[in-house]
Every structure is written in C-alpha cells, then in structure tokens.
From Swiss-Prot:
The lineage of its organism: Eukaryota, Metazoa, Chordata, Craniata, Vertebrata. Residues 202-221 form the UIM domain. InterPro entries: ENTH, ENTH_VHS, UIM_dom. Residues 150-266, 281-475, 498-530, 575-608 are annotated as: Disordered. A 1,2-diacyl-sn-glycero-3-phospho-(1D-myo-inositol-4,5-bisphosphate) binds at R8, K11, R25, N30, R63, H73. Residues 287-372 are annotated as: 5 X 3 AA repeats of [DE]-P-W. Induction: In keratinocytes, by wounding or contact with collagen. Coiled coil: none annotated. Its main location: cytoplasm. CDD domains: ENTH_Epsin. It is found in: Cytoplasm, Cell cortex; Cytoplasm, Perinuclear region; Cytoplasmic vesicle, Clathrin-coated vesicle; Nucleus. SUPFAM superfamilies: ENTH/VHS domain. It comes from Rattus norvegicus (Rat). Residues 12-144 form the ENTH domain. The gene is Epn3. This is Epsin-3.
Length: 608
C-alpha cells in the first residue's frame, strides 16, 4: 500500500465519508493510472439511488474544483462524469446541464509541472468532449444505448467465464493447479465483479436479456427440427417422411395384434364351455358327480350343445354285469368338461343307481362285496336273464332259505323286515323272527327281561340262599345282629322323592344334652298369683326368690296409691299420678323348680 493510499484511508475515517464518497475518492485519486472500469460501474449503479446519487455528485463537483497541483483529480473526475453520463442515471445529465458553467470554466485550466510539461491540455480536451456530449442530446441518447449494450454483453461474458472458472475449480478441487490458475488470473475476478448486477434495474435488464436470448435459441432449435421435413440435396428421403410412412404400418400391426388377442380370448371361452372330444382312455373326469359310460363317442352335428340326458334322471338298465359297490367308477371315456351334459348311450355297461328299487340279481363269483352294505339275498336261478342295478339302501328281497325261516318271515306283518339290523323306532312292536331255527331277540325288546322278572306258575322257583344253606346246622347257634339293632322308625313324609331313602329323624340330634325348657304352665305355677300374701307363694321360701329385670313386677308389690284414679282422662293433668316410691321391691323368682326335672329325651342320633 502506497503512502497516498494510506493517507486517503485516514482522511476517509477522519471525515467520516460514506461508501459512495469513498468509492468516488478512490476512482479520482492522484495515482498515475486511470480509474478502474469496475469501480466506475459500481458508482454508475449507485446513481440510481437517490441518497447515493447526491453523495456521488457532491464528491464529483468537489474534485472538479481542485487546484492545478491536483490536476489528476480534475481529469479523473471528468472521466468519471463522462462514464456516468453514458451508463448512469439520467439525472446525472440534468444536474450537469444545471452546473454547466462550472464545467465550462475548466476550458482555461492551466498547469505546467516541474519538467515544463503542460498537464492542463489533458483537462481541456476532456472538458470539450463532455461539453459536446451535454449539448447534443441525440448523440447522448445513442451513446447511452451503445454503452448499455456493451455493459450487458460484458456482464454475460463475465458470468460465463465466472461459471466456467467456478465449475473447473470444483472439478479440480484438491489439485494445486486449481489454486495457481485462480490466483494467476485476477482479470477474471474483476470481470466477474463487473458483471454482477449492482441495482434492481440492472438485474431486471439482465433478466429480460436472458429471456430474449433463450427465446431466440428455442426458435433456432425449432427451425433445425423443421429442417427434416425438407428434402435433402442428394435426393435421399427425409426422416420426417420416413417417420410418417412408418406410422400407418405400426397402426396396422397394433390392430392385427388386438384382433388376434380378442379372437384367442373368444376361442378360449368357447373351449371352456364346449365338450371335449372323446378319447379311448380311462375315466379321469374332474366332476365328482360325473357318471361314467354316458359320454357320446361323437359330437352331434349342428351345434356344440347337443341333446343330453338329465344327470339326475334314473339310469336305464343294461345287459352287462353290475357291481355291488354303488360308487365304483368303470373305466370309460375321459372328459375335461366338469359340468358338461352326458347323453344316453344305446349300449354299454349299465350303471348302478343307488336310489332305484332293487331286484333279485344273480349271484356271480366276480361280484365285489361291500363290507358296509346290507346283506344281499340272491337266488340261484336267473329267471329274468338280465342283471338289475343293486340298491344298498333298499330292503333285501326274498331268497331261497329253509322252510322254517320262510314261514316265520311270512308270519310277520306286511312291511316288517325280518332283518335284526333294520328296526323301525316309530313302528309297532313286532314278534321276533327265527333265524336258522333259533329265536332271535330284537335290540330294544324288553320282553325277555319281563319274563325273567315275573315268576310263571308252571316253572319251578329258584331256591333262595340262606346262611343255614351256606354254613350248615351250626348257623342256628349264631347271634342274629339284625334282631338286636332296631332301625329307627321313618317319619312319614309326603315327599315322593324321598321314597327308598332314610327319612330324617324328627328330633334334633345336636340338642340331646340340653335340658328341657319349662313350659308355660310350669312358669305360671312357679310365679306368685294374684291375691297371695306378700310373703311369697305357698311352699316357696322368700330367700329362694331372686330378682330379674326382664320380668314384670308382681301386682302385690305395687302400692295402693299407684293405681290410676277413675277421674283421669285421656290427657292427664299435672299431679294426676302419684310420685313413684323411693325404693321398689325386687321381683321374686323361684331358684328351684317345684316340679322335678324332666327326664332327658332319648336321642336317636346314630353318631352319639
């Protein structure tokens, strides 16, 4: 830092100059170089502020009035004024026109230095330029427009350089070359500072300029894309035409794919509901109620839904042999249709209907036996010639058996089954039937038990066993304990639910040891009666009488004056009653009962 710069900073602090004034003093110093453009740009931005504008212009006029020794102050002040007229606020030109006389006096500025060189000529030439600019308004307007465009261009270039420099420094952070490059280019930093907007007006202007440039770039991009529509010079087909030719082909392909998918979905639905073709394989239908052997070999012509039979209708009988198991599935045609209808076949193995009435079937060695089914009675003679379906839930028919069992079966009422398993809980009781010559009892028949309980006169009674029969003649000398122990008499009760149980004893077993309480007659005979002498009852001494507060006083102990007079009304007056005596005699109770104590009741408690 030079001596002049240090002296200038001290003056700024002593005179308490503002920021705008300090910048003007820095731009118009006595240094042998001109004012920096960045500093002049900041001062020009400050002129848009009213307060800063007054400070800037006041310091400029002070610099213009310096003496010849400080000719650099005057020359730099004129240079700054020229810059403010072109890039600053319009009020700068108005104020300069108002103070035009001060500027004109500088045309005669004279100063010759020690070397004899005229330094005033520079000031005079600069004053002429400023005066010509102030007098020609059209030129001033053109100069302002050109200066603003140049400033905006420099600001954009500075922003681009600054952003590139910042991006490069971010990418190369940590490398020593980044620090050297940043430190070795102070011009980039000054341009960046110059490009930054200092006021709101400049910022708005830069924003509008950026929008215009972006709009122009967008238009250029649209023109470059539109250039594909024009044919090229070598006769090749443009890309836009090829793209338009490919669009209908793509649409046709999409339509064909949609049509194929729709047709395939319709065919899938038709396949689901249509019956599957018959294949000569084992029966593997997924339908649990699918009856085998009823699948047509060929589909009826005309439609996929041919005439079919009701799966719940009775199945016609065939000529082939039948099975005794109702749920056996014969190996027949396979089907993938779970709920399809099955037409009736004219020929084939018959299907056993579990719900149809049964008929006599011939006994065949190859017939399967159902362990859970009822016994089947078959005949040795096949008079009918054809086998009929077997019903496991139907009643068995007559069969060839001995004459005795047949007669016993015919003796039963009509509708009753001789089978011991079949029992009608709601029917009348039927006599038991004989099987193989032996009388068979029913499950719920209690007649046998009744016959065993009731003694028939024709039968010999079973002898009852006694101790004599078991011990012999020596049993007569034994003591019979049953005769010694007497059972307590049962109290007669009307409770029907206590029959057969030991009746409760009428006496309290827990009060056997207590003495009986005196009866009312005993208490009456023991208490003194009316009209007895005050000495006490006859035969009872006075010394044996005790006082009891719970018993009333005897009438003989009440004085004669204590009786109520006849003149006392419902509401007695004061003094109607005699005052109570001072001492009342004690009531007398007999200490010993004149009647002897009652004998204790004989308790019948078996636990005492």
């Amino acid at each position: 830092m030079t001596t002049s710069a240090l002296r200038r900073q001290v003056k700024n602090i002593v005179h308490n100059y503002s920021e705008a004034e300090i910048k003007v003093r820095e731009a118009t110093s006595n240094d042998p170089w001109g004012p920096p453009s960045s500093l002049m740009s900041e001062i020009a931005d400050l002129t848009f502020n009213t307060v800063a504008f007054a400070e800037v212009m006041g310091m400029v006029w002070r610099r213009l009035n310096d003496s010849g020794k400080n000719w650099r102050h005057v020359y730099k002040a004129l240079t700054l004024l020229d810059y403010l007229l072109k890039t600053g606020s319009e009020r700068v030109a108005h104020q300069c026109r108002e103070n035009l006389y001060t500027i004109q006096t500088l045309k005669d500025f004279q100063y010759i230095d020690r070397d004899g060189k005229d330094q005033g000529v520079n000031v005079r030439e600069k004053v002429k330029q400023v005066m010509a600019l102030l007098k020609d308004e059209e030129r001033l307007r053109q100069e302002r427009t050109h200066a603003l465009k140049t400033k905006e261009r420099m600001a954009l270039e500075g922003m681009g350089i600054g952003s590139g420099q910042l991006g490069f420094s971010r990418r190369s952070r940590g490398s020593p070359s980044s620090y050297t490059s940043a430190s070795s280019s102070p011009r980039y930093a000054s341009d960046l500072e110059q490009a930054r907007p200092q006021t709101s007006g400049e910022e708005e202007l830069q924003l509008q300029l950026a929008l215009a440039m972006s709009r122009e770039e967008a238009e250029k991009g649209g023109r470059s894309w539109k250039g594909d529509d024009f044919p090229v010079a070598n006769g090749a087909e443009p890309a836009g035409q090829r793209r338009r030719d490919r669009e209908p082909e793509r649409e046709e392909r999409k339509e064909e794919e949609k049509l194929k998918t729709s047709q395939s979905s319709i065919l899938d639905l038709a396949d689901v509901f249509a019956p599957a073709p018959a294949l000569p394989s084992t029966h593997c239908s997924a339908d649990p109620w699918d009856i085998p052997g009823l699948r047509p070999n060929t589909e009826p012509s005309g439609s996929s839904w041919g005439p079919s039979a009701d799966p719940w209708s009775p199945v016609p009988s065939g000529n082939a042999l039948s099975r005794s198991q109702p749920w056996d599935l014969l190996p027949t045609l396979s089907s993938s249709e779970p709920w399809g209808r099955t037409p009736v076949l004219p020929s084939g193995p018959p299907i056993t209907d579990p719900w149809a009435p049964s008929s006599p079937t011939p006994k065949l060695p190859s017939t399967g036996v159902d362990p859970w089914g009822a016994s089947v009675e078959t005949s040795n003679t096949s008079a009918l010639g054809g086998a009929s379906p077997f019903d496991p839930f139907a009643k068995p028919l007559e069969s060839t058996e001995p004459m005795e069992s047949r007669d016993s079966a015919q003796a039963l009422p009509k509708g009753k089954s001789p089978s011991p398993v079949e029992l009608d809980p709601f029917g009348d009781s039927s006599p038991s039937c004989k099987q193989n010559g032996v009388k068979e009892t029913e499950a719920l028949d209690l007649g046998v038990l009744g016959e065993a309980l009731t003694q028939q006169p024709g039968k010999e009674a079973r002898p009852c066993r006694t101790p004599e029969s078991f011990l012999g003649p020596s049993a007569s000398s034994l003591v019979n304990l049953d005769s010694l122990v007497k059972a307590p008499l049962a109290a007669r009760t009307r409770n029907p639910f206590l029959t057969g149980l030991s009746a409760p004893s009428p006496t309290n077993p827990f009060g056997a040891g207590e003495q009986g309480r005196p009866t009312l007659n005993q208490m009456r005979t023991g208490s003194p009666a009316l009209g007895l002498p005050p000495g006490g009852p006859v035969g009872v001494p006075l010394g044996s009488m005790t006082y009891s507060a719970s018993l009333p006083l005897p009438l003989s102990s009440v004085p004669v004056g204590a009786t109520l007079p006849a003149s006392v009304s419902v509401f007695p007056q004061a003094g109607a009653f005699a005052p109570p005596p001072a001492s009342l005699p004690q009531p007398l109770l007999p200490t010993s009962d004149p009647v002897g104590p009652l004998p204790p009741q004989a308790g019948t408690n078996p636990f005492l």
